[in-house]
Amino acid sequence: MYSPYCLTQDEFHPFIEALLPHVRAFSYTWFNLQARKRKYFKKHEKRMSKEEERAVKDELLGEKPEVKQKWASRLLAKLRKDIRPECREDFVLSVTGKKAPCCVLSNPDQKGKIRRIDCLRQADKVWRLDLVMVILFKGVPLESTDGERLAKAPQCASPGLCVQPHHIGVTIKELDLYLAFFVQAPDSGQSDSSNPQGDADIKPLPNGHLSFQDCFVTSGVWNVTELVRVSQTPVATASGPNFSLADLESPGGYYNISPVTLGRRPLGPPTASGPKRPKALDEGDLEGPGDDVFYSGPGRSPAPGSSQGPWGGDVDTSPATLKKSGKLDFCSALSGHAASPRMAFGHHPLPVLAGVRPASALHFPSGSLLPQSGPYFAHPTIRYHHGQDSLKDFVQFVCADGAAQGPQHSQRPAPPLPPALSASDPATATF
């Protein structure tokens, strides 16, 4: 069973969950439609007919929302690997509207140019990363050969490697403008008000001759209204609107989706058994060497640990296991770190995800998004770096170890507390 955002244990990552609501559902249909057309041509050595292409389009548009979201989450994982680590957080913040757009650089290929990626399983075509960005986040129907039609904004400082979708535009020629009028006017029933020649002045040609615009032949199976409507629909809203994202606004971070609204049970304060921090994701598919893992927003942590296979492989949804790196002595640790403000983790506010623009409405099932083993450590906007989690690990496991080893330590007297702490000190009441 898929979660509303299709973030299974192997696919969950803050980067993916933050960007998924901003992916256009049109991108799934477009990438798959292009692949079907290429496959058909290789097999039959002829192009699809309009009827066949329209049938494939309708089939893809009617695909289950979980399938589209699962595809989008895997593609976002690939995008993350091909973006420079120092640009990933800026990319998320700019796409979610928390920060002004800035350059987001692609990892260069062997020639120093923008990388190309495959967007489907067993794909026979690779797409330039900037093309993928524009299709994913703007819903522009570009082909894989349209790279030279892209133009970078004047404020873009690195046009050779920048893949920021807000820095990328599409060049329009005079022919495009001319055709746009004749294609849009019959579809909408209205013409440009600036046109000095009204509809009454356009007279039909005699002797059955067709006007020039009547000879236009579209190569695709989309009309203007349908294309615009589908390209503006987020992939996360395919299950049907029921409430507005405007009700979910909350400050901080680059999330803005309440765990309660998503069907996830609220994270309560630490219990007597103590919180357990799940092992971080195996970064085989989501992490590169030396990458930072961002848990932005008040108290966001990764899902329970699991092994990440190849991006095109099947998803393993087996229950996660928690591991402890070692034993911690409760009393001796208190003497060294009790004065740290991080120790009073029970007083932090409950985790709330923050940051998706209220552009559309979402409706999700009420089931739990991810299996929860216990409340997470809550602290606003923390960056966890590899090899620097000693104090955090102590905070996560000190209560659990203290409670579990309490009966064993009852046979020997505990060492006296430091002078800075006493039984009446309210700071020690947390433990």
Swiss-Prot record:
Top-rank lineage group of the source organism: Eukaryota
A Pfam family: NfI_DNAbd_pre-N
Record keywords, A-Z: Activator, DNA replication, DNA-binding, Nucleus, Transcription, Transcription regulation
Biased composition (Low complexity): 296-309, 420-431
Keyword Nucleus included in the entry's annotation: yes
Keyword Protease set for record: no
DNA-binding region, residues: 1-194
Subcellular locations according to the entry: Nucleus
The protein's role, per its UniProt record: Recognizes and binds the palindromic sequence 5'-TTGGCNNNNNGCCAA-3' present in viral and cellular promoters and in the origin of replication of adenovirus type 2. These proteins are individually capable of activating transcription and replication.
Family membership noted in the UniProt record: Belongs to the CTF/NF-I family.
Entry protein name: Nuclear factor 1 X-type
UniProt source species: Gallus gallus
